[in-house]
């Protein structure tokens, strides 16, 4: 075909030199495209970094909304006698705690009884029971004890209460005048162990 010249044997131009010139020309033509590709790569990398920072900022913003989780202060020391906690509203500083009164276990006693084996409740009849309920604020459930007619003496009450192994212990104390009292004592100290005693089904006990 006209206009087409052959390279190689029979041609007067050096083949190697011609190929190098063609390659150089092609590389020069591709230089702008190569620069543009590098520019695109740099932009994509920059976008990725910006996106990563935005994700971190969004996560931090969501955490800032949860003010109840932000605590600006903390307690440095621990104490055996009491527990100290702080929150975000506490002012930074040193504090002194003075104990003016120690917590103690509550003790209750029954009315005086001459014979510890005498029933002090009503006679309900065979098969019927009454329920002794001891409520303490610090306990999840009140202590409930079902009692038959034969279990209303203070010695039987003592045994029934102790058998439950709750936060209340029962003992019998003999006074100087010879009378006896059923004494109930909370096993734990503090106001949460204060006892409230009621009897369901027996107005006399």
From Swiss-Prot:
Keywords: Bacterial flagellum, Secreted. GO terms for cellular component: bacterial-type flagellum filament cap; bacterial-type flagellum hook; extracellular region. It comes from the Bacteria. It comes from Proteus mirabilis. It is found in: Secreted; Bacterial flagellum. The keyword Secreted applies. This is Flagellar hook-associated protein 2. It holds the Pfam family Flagellin_IN.
């Amino acid at each position: 075909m006209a206009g087409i010249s052959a390279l190689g044997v029979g041609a007067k131009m050096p083949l190697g030199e011609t190929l190098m010139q063609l390659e150089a020309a092609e590389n020069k033509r591709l230089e702008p495209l190569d620069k543009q590709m590098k520019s695109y790569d740099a932009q994509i990398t920059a976008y990725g970094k910006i996106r990563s920072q935005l994700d971190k900022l969004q996560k931090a913003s969501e955490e800032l909304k949860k003010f109840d989780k932000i605590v600006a202060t903390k307690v440095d020391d621990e104490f055996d006698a009491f527990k100290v906690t702080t929150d975000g509203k506490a002012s930074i500083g040193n504090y002194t705690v003075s104990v003016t009164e120690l917590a103690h276990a509550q003790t209750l006693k029954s009315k005086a009884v001459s014979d510890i084996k005498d029933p002090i409740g009503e006679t309900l009849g065979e098969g019927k029971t009454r329920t002794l309920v001891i409520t303490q604020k610090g306990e999840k459930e009140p202590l409930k004890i079902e009692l038959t007619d034969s279990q209303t003496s203070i010695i039987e009450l003592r045994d029934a209460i102790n058998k439950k192994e709750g936060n209340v212990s029962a003992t019998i104390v003999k006074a100087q005048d010879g009378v006896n009292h059923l004494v109930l004592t909370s096993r734990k100290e503090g106001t949460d162990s204060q006892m409230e005693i009621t009897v369901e089904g027996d107005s006399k006990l």
